[in-house]
Curated annotation (Swiss-Prot):
The gene is queC. This is 7-cyano-7-deazaguanine synthase. InterPro entries: QueC (IPR018317), Rossmann-like_a/b/a_fold (IPR014729). Binds 1 zinc ion per subunit. One of its GO terms (biological process) is queuosine biosynthetic process. ATP binds at F10, S11, G12, G13, Q14, D15, S16, T17, T18, L19, A20. Its EC number is 6.3.4.20. It catalyses: 7-carboxy-7-deazaguanine + NH4(+) + ATP = 7-cyano-7-deazaguanine + ADP + phosphate + H2O + H(+). It comes from the Bacteria. It is an enzyme of class 6 (ligase). SUPFAM superfamilies: Adenine nucleotide alpha hydrolases-like (SSF52402).
Length: 228
């Protein structure tokens, strides 16, 4: 029975919403878990709650607001750093990177999975079309899966069906799953928390790295649709 339970890391964004629908079609029980880490775009939590209700899936938020007190990122509410620059702690990374964020998320998801008897965790990470975050790469995910299972004497699988999909392919996946309209109108990606203007690709400021990546992906998706 436990093989039929999946815990989905759920932010209310394009990736995690597509992932949630994917999981719902494959597992008997799906639990959505989100994180409040004092992010500027906390409106995503409101979007996540609405989407969870529309999908009729249980949703729980874990508070991690202490993160902004122990590390630095342009994503935090207390940050005055402008997006699009290098991280002050590591010039090779964008300043929107939150050090060890995914490691913390995955560790907590792993504990949650043990609590409810789930043998699967699903993440919406991708290394094909991403923002330069090393903790979204396959080698990191495989390594932390191995470490957490060693430390807990478990065999919980971390599933990453979007790992090698770019944004255009993710839009196609959403279309194939029958939720393209939901992804465009209800999900949130914008780092600035902007939800006043609905663009063709969804709501956003149209300027931050997240919006630019999503816009580019949608335009590529539309181009492929036209030539199909």
């Amino acid at each position: 029975m436990e093989q039929e339970i999946c815990v989905v890391s759920f932010s209310g964004g394009q990736d995690s919403t597509t992932l949630a629908v994917w999981a719902k079609k494959r597992f008997k029980k799906v639990y959505l878990v989100g994180f409040d880490y004092a992010q500027k775009h906390s409106v995503e939590l409101e979007c996540a709650q609405k989407i969870a209700s529309l999908l009729q899936l249980p949703y729980e938020i874990i508070s991690l607001d202490f993160l902004e007190n122990i590390t630095r990122s342009a994503l935090f509410k207390n940050s005055n750093d402008l997006m699009g620059h290098s991280h002050v702690q590591n010039k090779d990374l964008p300043n929107s990177f939150v050090p060890n964020r995914n490691a913390i998320f995955i560790t907590l998801l792993h504990s949650y999975a043990q609590k409810i008897g789930a043998s699967n965790i699903a993440l919406g990470v991708s290394q094909a079309d991403f923002s330069g975050y090393p903790d979204c790469k396959e080698d990191f995910i495989k390594s932390i899966e191995h470490a957490l299972n060693l430390g807990s004497n478990t065999a919980i699988k971390i599933l990453t069906p979007l790992m090698f999909l770019n944004k255009a392919q993710e839009f196609q996946m959403a279309k194939d799953l029958g939720v393209l309209d939901l992804v465009i109108k209800e999900t949130h990606t914008c780092y600035q928390g902007e939800r006043k203007i609905l663009h063709a690709y969804g709501y956003g400021c149209n300027e931050c790295p997240a919006c630019q990546l999503r816009k580019k992906g949608y335009e590529e998706f539309q181009t492929k649709v036209l030539f199909q």
